[in-house]
Structures are given as structure tokens and as C-alpha cells.
Amino acid sequence: SARALRTEVAFTILKDGSVAGIEVVVKSGSYGFDAAAMAAIEAAGNAKAFGPLPRTFPGDALPVTFFFTPKGPQ
């Protein structure tokens, strides 16, 4: 069922706000759902939606893990 879908995607936010190393860490069992989750992260990175890392950030990159689940009707 759609409610059981959950995928875990890991990636790195670079200093300029772009992303690298997008990978599915835990698959949902649905190739389409996993691909859509990766595409969402890639699109956000391309749009620099995460913003640049703060100048005071102690490093060149920030590793991040997102968990995706489908949003049902409200």
C-alpha cells in the first residue's frame, strides 16, 4: 500500500548550496517512488533550495539523510 512506502535518501550539501552524492540508502520497494525521491533532492540542489552553508560552518560539506513517505489525502 502507498502508506507503507518509505525511502531513505542520503546526500551532501556543498558550500554553495548544491548537492552531491545522492543515493538511496533504504529502498521503499517501489523503483518509481525511490527515483522520485532522488529527483526531488536533485531538483532542490539544482535550484539551490537548501541555500549555501553558513560561512562559520566548520567544513566544506554537510551530509544529510532525508526520509520520504507519500502524503495521503487530507
Language model feature labels by segment:
Residues S1, M38-Q74:
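Short, positively biased Gly/Pro-containing turn/loop motifs at secondary-structure boundaries
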Residues R3-E8:
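Short, small/polar residue-rich loop motifs at catalytic or cofactor-binding pockets
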Residues V9-A10, G21:
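Conserved beta-strand and immediately adjacent loop positions that scaffold enzyme active sites
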Residues S18-P52:
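A short, well-structured alpha-helical segment
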Residues I13-L14:
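Short, acidic, Ser/Thr-enriched surface-loop or helix-capping motifs
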